[in-house]
Amino acid sequence: MAKEYSRTSRVSQQVQKELARILQQEVKDPRIGMVTISGVDVTRDLAYAKVFVTFLTVGDQTNDESLEGLNAAAGYIRRLLGKAMRLRIVPEVRFCFDSTLTEGLRISELVSGAVKADKTKLAASGRTEEDED
């Protein structure tokens, strides 16, 4: 049975904090822009870290370009991470786009549209929401 708060989860949280600081203060690649780290998954042996990111895109910049910039700077970011954290093995960083935010917004819009359509149908039929209950 695994511990409820294992070492890998603690390392994941610390990696997330340090990467957020590094991306904000150290990395100056214009392709990257505004990045939000939504989560970090570290393997049990701490060799790899999959970093889930979302972007606040500005202008013509796309998520693919920003992700390409992050993955190009992964070695430099790993070196800075090694300086910031006291680990015997610094995880190899891999950046992945996190689509949960956009999917959540899409689902929220679908639900809002369905509720609005139901209200217009009720109003058109002359009934109220209390009559339905």
Swiss-Prot record:
GO terms for cellular component: cytosol. InterPro entries: KH_dom-like_a/b, RbfA, RbfA_dom_sf, Ribosome-bd_factorA_CS. Coiled coil: none annotated. Keywords: Cytoplasm, Ribosome biogenesis. It comes from the Bacteria. Pfam families: RBFA. It is found in: Cytoplasm. GO terms for biological process: maturation of SSU-rRNA. Its main location: cytoplasm. GO terms for molecular function: ribosomal small subunit binding. Monomer. Binds 30S ribosomal subunits, but not 50S ribosomal subunits or 70S ribosomes. This is Ribosome-binding factor A. It comes from Psychromonas ingrahamii (strain DSM 17664 / CCUG 51855 / 37). The gene is rbfA.
